């Protein structure tokens, strides 16, 4: 396990760091390292020494060793938070000299949920562009874990420039219920990696249209919820196909690009890409984005994509305007649509129902919920490591 040291080389380039917090965040960082994402330094921090020892991140350290003795946060966000506060000075030293930091975590557990807001807070105090990319739990993980995740996300959004939330439950809609659990988590890691690669490649990799760090900072500093989508197209109409897939991503929360205050577009293709294709992508984005949105487009030349063309869209500032709410799901929308009359006092039970609405197609079944909790406990420990 290496000690952290400040690297002063390449002063002309933006220094980007990716920090995986907790088990889920650490696994995401390890996946990015294995995928060979360039232009960023990867760090994994955790309260669980055993999980950290197995992680392949080049830089890592134990959070809150005095509090947890390296045994983890026990799914308690308060312990995760205290662990991060214990090592606040160390986090500050680790982040000094950084231009942009990605913080990735699985929300709903102890370390990721509790420590990620503290890491973000430290980064913002150092005037670092801070983007969090986090996942929300599967329904099978239980309502308690989902409630913890939502509370953590609510706290985290106050400490970052942009927050991208990926609901794991959406994976079931895209991959199908027969998809293996390991494959589902791998796909979640792919989405997390795609967000980091989409932004870092635009800054670090050469292309027909180069974008500097100041351009990225302009877009990503539009505080609020962000969305990320990736699309791949092939054939003569590949540019339009890729762009439309990117803005209609099914792995994201039900939010509209129309509310975005800033849009960052990464177009990745081989050397045969044409200006006409770049224009086609731009036209598609213009049709979806707000007319006053700041749109920054960059290209990355990568022969590994073959004859395909890939478009990654990062839309920011979703929630910055008074008329825009934070990320919401379909069932919450239905409840809000009926709330047109004079508000009445609510009981605790009614307030809890509004904050955690049931799905539209069924009434919550207590026995079924208890069964889901039991199923989660039956998941092997090597899989549950992903969830902390």
Write out the residue ranges for each language-model feature.
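Tubulin/FtsZ superfamily GTPase core signature
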Residues: 1-388
């Amino acid at each position: 396990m290496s000690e952290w040291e400040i690297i002063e080389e390449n002063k002309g380039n933006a220094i980007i760091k990716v920090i995986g917090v907790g088990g889920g965040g650490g696994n995401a960082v390890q996946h990015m390292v294995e995928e060979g994402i360039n232009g960023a330094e990867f760090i994994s921090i955790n309260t669980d020494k055993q999980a950290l020892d197995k992680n392949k991140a080049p830089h890592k350290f134990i959070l809150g060793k005095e509090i947890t003795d390296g045994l983890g946060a026990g799914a308690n966000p308060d312990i995760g938070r205290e662990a991060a506060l214990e090592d606040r000075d160390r986090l500050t030293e680790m982040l000094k000299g950084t231009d942009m930091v990605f913080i990735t975590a699985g929300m709903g557990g102890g370390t990721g949920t509790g420590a990620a807001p503290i890491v973000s807070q430290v980064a913002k105090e150092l005037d670092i562009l801070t983007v969090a990319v986090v996942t929300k739990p599967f329904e099978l993980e239980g309502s308690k874990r989902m409630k913890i995740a939502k509370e953590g996300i609510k706290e985290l959004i106050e400490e970052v420039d942009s927050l991208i939330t990926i609901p794991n439950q959406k994976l079931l809609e895209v991959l199908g219920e027969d998809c293996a659990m390991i494959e589902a988590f791998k796909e979640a890691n792919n989405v997390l990696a795609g967000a980091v690669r989409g932004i870092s490649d635009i800054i670090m990799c050469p292309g027909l249209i180069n974008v500097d760090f100041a351009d990225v900072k302009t877009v990503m500093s539009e505080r609020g919820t962000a969305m990320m989508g990736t699309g791949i197209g092939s054939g003569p109409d590949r540019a339009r196909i890729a762009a439309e897939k990117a803005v209609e991503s099914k792995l994201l929360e039900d939010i509209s690009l129309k509310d975005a205050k800033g849009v960052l577009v990464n177009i990745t293709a081989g050397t045969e890409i044409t200006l006409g294709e770049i224009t086609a992508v731009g036209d598609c984005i213009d049709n979806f984005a707000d007319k006053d949105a700041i749109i920054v487009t960059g290209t990355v030349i990568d022969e590994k994509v073959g004859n395909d063309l890939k478009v990654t869209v990062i839309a920011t500032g979703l929630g910055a305007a008074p008329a825009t709410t934070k990320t919401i799901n379909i069932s919450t929308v239905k409840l809000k649509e009926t709330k047109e009359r004079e508000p009445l006092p609510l009981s605790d039970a009614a307030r809890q129902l509004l904050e955690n609405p049931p799905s539209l197609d069924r009434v919550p079944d207590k026995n079924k919920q208890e069964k889901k909790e039991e199923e989660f406990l039956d998941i092997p420990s090597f899989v549950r490591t992903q969830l902390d």
